[in-house]
Regions:
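Conserved N-terminal subdomain of the carbohydrate kinase-like
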Residues: 2-95
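Phosphate- and divalent-cation-binding pockets in alpha/beta enzyme and binding domains
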Residues: 33, 131-132, 164
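Single conserved hydrophobic/aromatic residue that forms the stacking wall/gate
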Residues: 155-158, 162-165
Length: 165
């Protein structure tokens, strides 16, 4: 366990030492929290979701975060352009497909991003991940269904007890 903690501490120190610029195309509900969290770990956030600058900002960034929380047609173009630029430059891309499975627009956007951008980290709740895996889901946005919570709890308990499902 000590080696994991030491590795995390070294990684955190490195982030503080280099203060990387993190380009976020994120939702307006959490934009302030996202910026403050990035600042708290020693990085520097920039929120740029206009197509006129998305690729340019990505080209000077050390990471790109794409979040579909407050999705609109304008930002989809920026997400894809920034993602392609990040891939071209070897910049890691974090993708949060918020609400995937909830609407055709979100489903098509998630599919488009996954087809056009190499994702480094894919994050989301169980409903979103299940939808992306092609499973039947009842997505309600950022919330998971009761069945999803049951499955999540079951997997957690299995992990805690050392059992495989």
């Amino acid at each position: 366990m000590g080696s994991i903690i030491e590795s995390c501490a070294k990684a955190a120190d490195k982030v503080r030492d280099i203060c990387p610029l993190v380009h976020c195309i994120t939702n307006y509900v959490t934009v302030n929290d996202v910026a403050n969290c990035i600042l708290a770990i020693g990085a520097s956030p920039i929120m740029a979701d206009d197509i006129a600058e998305a690729a340019d900002i990505t080209s000077i960034s050390k990471a790109l975060v794409i979040n579909m929380g407050t999705l609109n047609a304008r930002t989809v173009e920026s997400m894809v352009a920034a993602g392609k630029k990040a891939n071209e430059l070897g910049v890691p891309v974090v993708f949060d497909p918020v609400g995937a499975g909830a609407s055709n627009f979100r489903n098509e956007t998630a599919k488009r991003i996954l087809e056009n951008v190499k994702i480094s980290i894919l994050r989301g709740n169980l409903s979103e991940m299940s939808y992306l895996a092609g499973l039947e889901v009842s997505t309600k946005g950022v919330d998971t269904s009761e069945a999803d919570e049951t499955v999540s709890y079951t997997h957690l308990r299995a992990h805690e007890t050392g059992r495989n499902l």
